Amino acid sequence: ITTSHRNRKTLENIFFQKMAKNNNIVIVFDFDKTIIDVDSDNWVVDELGFTDSFNQLLPTMPWNSLMDRMMKELHDHGKTIEEIKQVLRRIPIHPRVIPAIKSAHALGCELRIVSDANTFFIETIIEHLGISDFFSEINTNPGFVDEQGRLTISPYHDFTKSSHGCSRCPPNMCKGLIIERIQASFAKEGKKMKMIYLGDGAGDYCPSLKLKAQDYMLPRKNFPVWDLISQNPMLVKASVRDWTDGEAMERILMGIINEEEDQEKEKMLSSENCKLSVGIVHEPLLPLAIQVPLAKSC
């Protein structure tokens, strides 16, 4: 084994030790129809038998306000918080989504959720699935149980006081603004992060327009955000890679992470090899010793 080969293997070991702890990738997941396979709001309403009431009220108010109203309806009809939790715990999810999340976290990626669902639904589901500790941040509408045991859902952005100013997004949440805040926080900390965004709905289109050229947008194929991006793909600066189900999500996500790690590894090895070559000092050859004949003794 040559010295240069040993140096390279040493550098690779150092690299992988660092990458196992942390890398420069942040993965932002939508929740409904991305992490889980259905819309959590519709799932709860349908499973508890309030679909007709929901459909009657739908044209009369914003979705977020409607869900708060539906939680009141459930409470008024004697539905308990435990019944809501039981419904949420049996929500369908593709079997490869959880392994994808665990693998991404193990590889050092930072994971976040940006969703128009609510904290109660999301936290109940991810705690049941055993993945709550993998997410560093959840951006969603606040949901809490009041003293009467009724689930109350509030808007992420209180549109009754002011507008968030984005015409593309629902009044209670602009996911694009959330992405800009995340980007700004990394810039302030001096972190050069690459973002991978996964989503399915129309509300995921605005954040796709905020991504940079080094980022990745993963829209679910044949879902609203994919349709919107397909209308004018040039508007999205990020690399777009669509997916169809949890298996495809895992494969594409792991592929991107591996690609990014390979690029970072090559950069690091190239940089370190350069330092090694510059740091080597060649000592000048010493002149050969001159043999002096010993004097004869008298």
Where are the regions a protein language model picked out?
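Intrinsic-disorder-associated interaction segments
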Residues: 4, 8, 60-63, 77, ...
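Alpha-helical substrate-recognition element adjacent to the catalytic core
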Residues: 20-147
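C-terminal cap/substrate-recognition subdomain and adjoining C-terminal extension
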Residues: 96-102, 106-110, 117-298
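Mixed-charge, polar/low-complexity N-terminal
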Residues: 15-17, 60, 72-74, 164, ...
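Non-catalytic pre-domain segments flanking phosphatase-related domains
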Residues: 1-31, 42, 50-51, 55, ...
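A generic signature of intrinsically disordered, low-complexity regions enriched in glycine/proline
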Residues: 4, 9-11, 17, 34-36, ...
